[in-house]
Curated annotation (Swiss-Prot):
Tissue expression pattern: Expressed in seedlings, mostly in root tips, root hairs, and the vascular system. Also present in roots, leaves, stems, and flowers.
Superkingdom of the source species: Eukaryota
Presence of keyword Zinc: no
Localization annotation: Cytoplasm, P-body
Region (Disordered): 144-179, 196-246, 299-333
Cellular component, GO annotation: cytoplasm; extracellular region; P-body
GO molecular function: enzyme activator activity; hydrolase activity; protein homodimerization activity
PANTHER family: DECAPPING PROTEIN 1, ISOFORM A, TRANSCRIPTION FACTOR SMIF DECAPPING ENZYME DCP1
Biased composition (Pro residues): 315-331
Protein name per the record: mRNA-decapping enzyme-like protein
Length: 367
């Protein structure tokens, strides 16, 4: 299909997943399978000492993958802002909490991060998959099974047995050394269905940052209630955009695709998408772009811009304060730059302090 002499890729669900898997395997050859995909996410990091959020230079498509070696499960964000992709291991010490459309988590390095999802349903589905994976680790800790084929490293990592992870998540139904407990064998029986339904199939033009309409009913995990101020307004997506498996790097940097014009009109306020993050009473909108990397050149004409593909991306804003389980309050006093400045100014106003400085300088010069 072509429009204005430009070639538009026409990929179905399987072709898109295969292409995404090929790109991921260039980064990590041990990746075997993509379990689920989120079309667009933005990352924030939480400073525990200052109790405030700051924007990380990470945004793009999120992929939860299964690997053929340790660690068995990871999630990867193909970063559109720079060449550094974000990779996190899904191990037993991974903690998370959902406050849609945010997923807050603490990793093995004790860093507290927040993931903002464009699609709140994808946030819930990713959280459900995280829960299935982490529950497998907790099951192994409660019911350890001896396996002569496991290495010492695997024993220390306290991961689920190979049959638990490989059996239900693999396309093949056969597995070696399958445990006797049927609950282990069927533990991830619906994981692939979750990944597949979240990636609805459609033939037609495909764009890398299109956030699709998905007809299936999402899984509903047990999550914390969403924050009222963080509820995004509903934005209708154009009907032709249906695939939620975004096409990654091969098309994201193509200026021909990025600069295409169309019939989608957006009436948006002037964005502050790339300024320092701040708390807002209600979310703002930014113009719909294929790969959001810069504000519009002429903000006054932003409402007149026309794009052929993609939908307006909601203005991300700092997530809510993480719960004490993820970010405990600091126990000691916080020393900030302003407090140091105030202390020095108060010392300079004391004559005794000035006399001590003067005597010290005189003694140093005499020596």
């Amino acid at each position: 299909m072509s429009q204005n002499g430009k070639i538009i890729p026409n990929l179905d669900q399987n072709s898109t997943r295969l292409l995404n898997l090929t790109v991921l395997q260039r980064i990590d050859p041990y990746i075997e399978e993509i379990l689920i995909t989120a079309a667009h996410v933005t990352f924030y990091e939480f400073n525990i000492e200052l109790s405030q959020w700051s924007r990380k230079d990470v945004e793009g498509s999120l992929f939860v993958v299964k690997r053929s070696t340790q660690p068995r499960f990871q999630f990867i964000v193909m970063n559109r802002r720079n060449t550094d992709n974000l990779v996190e291991n899904l191990l037993g010490d991974f903690e998370y909490e959902v406050q849609g459309p945010y997923l807050l988590y603490r990793n093995a390095s004790q860093e507290v991060n927040g993931i903002w999802f464009y699609n709140k349903r994808e946030c819930e589905e990713v959280a459900t998959l995280f829960n299935r994976i982490l529950s497998a680790y907790s099951k192994v800790n409660q019911k350890p099974k001896a396996s002569s084929s496991k290495s010492e490293f695997e024993e220390l990592e306290a991961k689920p047995t190979m049959a638990v992870m490989d059996g239900p998540l693999e396309p093949s139904s056969t597995a070696r050394d399958a445990p006797d407990d049927p609950a282990f064998v069927n533990f991830f029986s619906s994981t692939m269905n979750l990944g597949n339904t979240a990636s609805g199939s459609a033939s037609g033009p495909y764009q890398s940052s299109a956030i699709p309409h998905q007809p299936h009913q999402p899984h509903q995990p047990t999550i914390a209630p969403p924050v009222a101020a963080a509820a995004p307004p509903q934005i209708q997506s154009p009907p032709p955009l249906q695939s939620s498996s975004p096409l990654m790097t091969l098309f994201d940097n193509n200026p021909e695709v990025i600069s295409s014009n169309s019939n989608i009109h957006t009436d948006l306020v002037t964005p502050s998408f790339f300024g320092p993050p701040r708390m807002m009473a209600q979310p703002h909108l930014i113009p719909g772009v294929s790969m959001p990397t810069a504000p519009p050149l002429n903000p006054n004409n932003a409402s007149h811009q026309q794009r052929s593909y993609g939908t307006p991306v909601l203005q991300p804003f700092p997530p809510p304060t993480p719960p004490p389980s993820l970010a405990p309050a600091p126990t000691g006093p916080v020393i900030s730059r302003d407090k140091v400045k105030e202390a020095l100014l108060s010392l300079l106003q004391e004559d005794e302090f000035i006399d001590k400085i003067t005597r010290t300088l005189q003694n140093a010069l005499q020596q």
